[in-house]
Swiss-Prot record:
Further information: The variability of the residues taking part of IgE-binding epitopes might be responsible of the difference in cross-reactivity among olive pollen cultivars, and between distantly related pollen species, leading to a variable range of allergy reactions among atopic patients.
Domain of life, per lineage: Eukaryota
Cellular compartment(s): Cytoplasm, Cytoskeleton
Record note on quaternary structure: Occurs in many kinds of cells as a complex with monomeric actin in a 1:1 ratio.
Keywords carried by this UniProt record: Actin-binding, Allergen, Cytoplasm, Cytoskeleton, Disulfide bond, Phosphoprotein
Primary subcellular site in the record, as a coarse category: cytoplasm
UniProt function note: Binds to actin and affects the structure of the cytoskeleton. At high concentrations, profilin prevents the polymerization of actin, whereas it enhances it at low concentrations.
GO molecular function, one term: actin monomer binding
Motif stretch (Involved in PIP2 interaction): 84-100
Similarity comment: family membership: Belongs to the profilin family.
Name of the protein: Profilin-3
């Protein structure tokens, strides 16, 4: 299965029980910042934004004072799981990033999708990739 298929079929899909509710954007990005696959709507990010995200996974709390930036959008960092998941909020939307052994799984959402639904979609794929040794 191609990485693009994971993005299209497992991240940008209808959310269970909520037809027409789906993430706004999604991607799978290597720890080095190389994009493995992304939705057409995923923002163009700067290398320093990806570096900040990777630093926060290694040093939890690193992004809290400045916020998480992706594609020029600033998200307020909210409770995640140290070293495993970063969550951010901006207005009625937000972002979830799950770290696997080799990649970061990104999901970006806006209402009517809820933070919990985004977390479920992103973390389910991230957990699957971890189980596969990826």
């Amino acid at each position: 299965m191609s990485w693009q298929t994971y993005v299209d079929d497992h991240l940008m899909c209808d959310i269970e029980g909520h037809e027409d509710h789906r993430l706004t954007a999604a991607a799978i990005v290597g720890h080095d910042g190389s994009v493995w696959a992304q939705s057409a709507t995923f923002p163009q990010f700067k290398p320093e934004e990806m570096n900040g995200i990777m630093t926060d996974f290694n040093e939890p709390g690193h992004l809290a004072p400045t916020g998480l930036h992706l594609g020029g959008t600033k998200y307020m960092v909210i409770q995640g799981e140290a070293g495993a998941v970063i969550r951010g909020k901006k207005g009625s939307g937000g972002i979830t990033i799950k770290k696997t052994g080799q990649a970061l799984v990104f999901g970006i959402y806006e209402e009517p999708v809820t933070p919990g639904q985004c977390n479920m979609v992103v973390e389910r794929l991230g957990d699957y990739l971890l189980e596969q040794g990826l």
